[in-house]
Each structure stands twice: as structure tokens, then as C-alpha cells.
Curated annotation (Swiss-Prot):
The gene is gatB. It comes from Methylobacterium radiotolerans (strain ATCC 27329 / DSM 1819 / JCM 2831 / NBRC 15690 / NCIMB 10815 / 0-1). Allows the formation of correctly charged Asn-tRNA(Asn) or Gln-tRNA(Gln) through the transamidation of misacylated Asp-tRNA(Asn) or Glu-tRNA(Gln) in organisms which lack either or both of asparaginyl-tRNA or glutaminyl-tRNA synthetases. The reaction takes place in the presence of glutamine and ATP through an activated phospho-Asp-tRNA(Asn) or phospho-Glu-tRNA(Gln). GO terms for molecular function: asparaginyl-tRNA synthase (glutamine-hydrolyzing) activity; ATP binding; glutaminyl-tRNA synthase (glutamine-hydrolyzing) activity. Belongs to the GatB/GatE family. GatB subfamily. SMART domains: GatB_Yqey. This is Aspartyl/glutamyl-tRNA(Asn/Gln) amidotransferase subunit B. Keywords: ATP-binding, Ligase, Nucleotide-binding, Protein biosynthesis. It catalyses: L-glutamyl-tRNA(Gln) + L-glutamine + ATP + H2O = L-glutaminyl-tRNA(Gln) + L-glutamate + ADP + phosphate + H(+); L-aspartyl-tRNA(Asn) + L-glutamine + ATP + H2O = L-asparaginyl-tRNA(Asn) + L-glutamate + ADP + phosphate + 2 H(+). It is an enzyme of class 6 (ligase). Heterotrimer of A, B and C subunits.
Amino acid sequence: MNAPVDPKKLIKGGLHDWEVIVGMEIHAQVSSRAKLFSGASTEFGAEPNDHVSLVDAAMPGMLPVINAECVAQAVRTGLGLKAKINLRSVFDRKNYFYPDLPQGYQISQYKDPIVGEGEVLVDLADGASITVGIERLHLEQDAGKSLHDQDPTRSFVDLNRSGVALMEIVSRPDLRSSEEAKAYVTKLRTILRYLGTCDGDMEKGSLRADVNVSVRRPGEPLGTRCEIKNVNSIRFIGQAIETEARRQIAILEDGGTIDQETRLFDPTKGETRSMRSKEEAHDYRYFPDPDLLPLEFDQAYVDALAEGLPELPDAKKARFVSAFGLSPYDAGVLVAERASADYYEAVAKGRDGKAAANWVINELFGRLNKEGLSIEATPVSADQLGTIIDLIGEGVISGKIAKDLFEIVWTEGGDPRVVVESRGMKQVTDTGAIEAAVDQIIAANPDKVAQAKEKPTLLGWFVGQTMKATGGKANPAAVNALLKAKLGIE
């Protein structure tokens, strides 16, 4: 029986409402210095064919040798996805011919993958969450890269990428919108980065998505799916799903049928186009690779890797909510990147967690976004930001002065305490000095004084004038208290 459909997720066609069904195959490059079956380097950006071993080039007589670190990284990823780790898995040959595949086959895993079923909890923008099932994770070799822009009449092949270890993470068709799909890939990338098993850099091709899209009328069986290959940004994933769903709906409402095929997304034209008919498993003639023994390890090996796992995003988010009193939303923002979470935790240590979150999210992240910088490149250290928060708490500076201080530390650096002293930024706490400023403003504005008793909101105007007169240095609480007393406002 089909679950009820959320009307907000339906796509309106010309004749009917339609439900989009999305499943994802994520190809994540394993973080490892060497390739899956050779000792060649995986460094990105080298000259073409600089990192190619005899195994990668498929020279006769060369035998693959499994890289143990790639196996460990796959197991760590499986544990991070709450998945079943298979103690015995098998490498198979996936047979097809392509210029950048020198062996004439890809070493992959078919019937017996290293990781079985798991799940990913995905938080959505509207505050809801969904659980996306993971069908499997298997290890496989990447192919090389064909270069078509080096010569007007010839194509070249770069085998630097050939043999690099990939984890193919296959989801169940549990996604029901482009927004859910984007949120899923974002969360999966966050988990991989926390684990240190893939850097998730889509610009470098470290994370690529094959997106399976089909549409159906609510309550009807699944439709025929099309696979959109190698989508290389989260924004493009969303656009590709929307575009392909619309294409399929138009065909079905016109009385046509959907061909199961592989397609490419063209972001400049905003369309998907046919690449080839979709292959089935039998087209690849899978069989166990005779050069590789089955991959076997024991539960003790898995348990040892599990003990070394870092705190993952969901657990960290729950801890931030309980330990620091944060809202789930703020905690989610902070744990989205491991470096951001570590920075926040350093700022919040021994301080008010909510105040620290406000400064990190609103001031720091806001400025980083404006400047196009990552948290790793911030010129304001966690110690410096923590000191600014301390100065507010100690009553040395006001919130307004703190923002000015943050700007100085951002652009010039320095110890915030020293900056406050050297630039005379301490707030005025001497009630006599504040009272003199208040009296002067009251004397200069008798008409507003009369109005204030009838309209208490004018208090804000007097506070602003007092702060202006004191260069923003007056203690706001003292200003408020004095003005209320002198204006007779309760």
C-alpha cells in the first residue's frame, strides 16, 4: 500500500498532478593516497598520465593488489551510514568497451558488495526530516578521462584517474522532490567529510551523482525511470530532476511512453538529452574477477574501525541542543561542516552557548559568506571571537561596540582586549557621566519629553540619542534605567 502523498510535493501537469520518484547513485572518490589496486598516486591536478602504473594501463601480466586503506574507508563509510557490513564480498568484472577503460572491463562489485542496507536521516528546510534508505555501497575502479579539446581532429586519454577507488552509494527511491534530493546529497557529503572517507569536492569530480527519475500519478505503480549521468553540483541535481520530471510528464500527458534510457543534463540549455539506451546487468556480463580472491575480514576488524569513528553530524547536533541549549535549526547550521562545528565548540567552551551560536552564525558566517571564504580561512580565530563575547559579558563593551570590535579584529587582527584598551572602546558605566548626557538630551527636547509619557515607545528614541552622544559607549541597561526614571515611564 502506498503512503499518503504530500500535496506540496506534487508537480502540476497540464491534465493531472504527478509525483516524482528519485533514487540516487553517488560515486564518492575514496580518500586514499594510492589507487584501489595499484600504488599509483591519486593526487589531483597532475600532468596527464603522470600517475599511471602498469596495472592502471592494463599491461599484460599485471595483477591487481587490493589497497587495504580503501577497504577500511569503505567500512567506515558503511558504519557512518548505519549499514550492514558484509564480512565477505566479491569483486566482479563489469565488461564494456570505452577508450578510457584500458582493461576492457571495470573491477566492481555486483552480487556481493562490501556494505549492505543502511539509512541517512535528512533534515529539510521546512523543519521536517525524512529517512532515506541505502540499498548498498560497493567499491569499484574509476575510469580514465577522454580529452576532446586538445586537438581539432584527435581525442586523447588521460589515465591519471584510471583505477582510483570509488564508493558507489546506492539509495532506495525514497526521494519525492528536487529539494529532498539536494538535501540528501548535502547530508551524505557532510557524513563523508566527517568520516574523512571522501573530500566531497564536486568541482574536482570527487563526488558525482547519477540521478534516477520517474513520475507517476499518486497511488499508481512506479513509472519507467531514466538515469541522468554524472551530475556534478548540488544545484544542477535539483535542476536536472525538475527538467526531467517535466519532460516525462509532457510525454505521458501527450499519450506517449517513457523509454528507459541514460540521459545527460545540459545546464546551459536547461534540458536533458538522450545518451544511450539504459543497460541492464546482463549487458555487462558480470562475473567474479579471477585475479582477486573474495574480500574477507572478521567482526573484530569492523569493531576496531567503529571505535575510531568521530562523532557524526546527527550525534553532534543532538549534543549541541542538549549541552548548549541551541535550537535544532541553529545546531543543524553549525554541524553542517565539521570545521564549523569544531570552531563553534571552541568558542562556546566555558561560555553561554546561545550567545556563542548567535555570534558564529550571524556575524561570522554572515561575513564569511559575504567575502566568499570558508571557515578554515576566517581571519577571526575562535579565541578572538570568544574574547569579544567575554568582553560583552563582563560589561566592558556593549553589543554595538562589539560589532565594531569584530570588524577591527577581522581586518587588522590583534587581541580584542588590547584593541579595546588602546582605542578607548570601553563602555561608560559611570552613572554620573551617563546621567549628564541624559539630562542634556531631555533639556534639549521638551516636546518629546511630554509625548513620551503618552507614547512610551519614544523611549527608544531617547536611548538612541544618548548612545549617540556617548559615542555608543554608554551601558545600555544603565541608559534605559535612567531614562525610564526621568521620563516617568513604567
